[in-house]
Amino acid sequence: MLSFGLGAIAQGDKSSCPGNLSIFAEFAKVKNYDSAYQPWKEVLTTCPELNVATFKYGERILAHKIKNASDDKTAYVQELMALYDDWITYFPTTKSGKSETGKILSSKAQAMIDYKSGSTLEAYEIFNQAFVQDAASFTSPKSLYTFFNTTFNLYKEGSLSTEELFNKYEEISEKFELEQTNLARKLDVVLNKEDAGEPVTSREQRNKRVYETNVLAFSTYANNLDAIISKESSCENLIPLYRKNFEANKTNSVWLNRAASRMDAKECSDDPLFVELVEALHGINPSANSAYYLGLLKDKAGDSQGALAYYEESLTLEQDQYRKAAILYKIAVKFKTKGLKSKARSYAKRALANQPSMGKAYMLIANLYAASANDCGNTQFEKRAVYWLAAKTARRAANVDSGVKKTALKMAASYEGRAPSKTDIFTEGNAGQTIRFSCWINDSVTVPQL
């Protein structure tokens, strides 16, 4: 019979605790969780305050027990729930004093969903408690996604309003962006050293692999987050919702910025409400975002010079290099849509100067090159050689950004398939030669050796 919760358990002989801690830790390190269970349980029951390892390894031990239980898993699931509660009681912070409450509570809520323990509402409330009390340590992309999926399920059941759904979507989306930016900052330190030819330590290489794994996870779950709400976040739904709440929020810069951002992202910016949102936002809080949106309005009015002036003002107002990179990329996309390839590349390169790990900027440039194949080069061979440059640029995207790696590699393979074949190179007899493109690309490629 398993026992839960430590409050009612009398503290026994603590002399065996250090030995049992050492025993279960050694078993757990080699994933022999069945052997680790009993000494771990004795430490948890007798001296839970001894070491945080009791809770970190305990989470893994109980996950193993739940997965491999031959009969009813309920007892182990309940024990896991109690473990999270006791974890917060005994080790709510790290050694340096940073709160772990958000991490622990979100792990508990995730386990409730994974093991179908408790109701959807109960899991939501614990997720929300974690997010409100300590968002800083609530960093798991899976749990952030599950938090919103739980929110969405409650909305579909009628327990949450449309407004509550969108508010939570904005909050969680912003958290995803924050964590992705934090990862980019760390990854770019290593990328900059590599690009400069500086030696990279083995620790930095290991860290880079961890960053890349996390970048991919955040990218995947962020895309899934958007997919959940795609139908609800149509212009037909957004505009009436924002119109209804505009008067009450026209001096709320956070609300105005979120509404304008969502309308821009969903291409609802042709509606007059977008103009009202942007003007209200810029009136109470002139910022990089509001200047960018004013640039959009100028663009839509056909005033390209006025738009560019606002875009540049936006960049001047923005002090953070990663937010600046995001704005530069959006401007690059606008110019690409207009067919202004050289300007689009220029802004994409400026984005990369601020965030070297922004793979989508390299992909945009690769796409610009591929779209110019018929406009560059004097011969058919030279025109098709542009695809080598496009493929090279797409591969660079894959190398710096694991979040787009799969798509970028497919793009590169597609471009390489359109480039001259080995037979073409043999016929031309130009293996190893350099081909320079004198069009707007103003770059060169080396013909592959046979």
Residue ranges of model-derived segments:
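Structural register within alpha-helical repeat arrays
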Residues: 23, 57-58, 62-65, 108-112, ...
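Solenoid-like repeat scaffolds
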Residues: 10-11, 41-49, 89-94, 129-137, ...
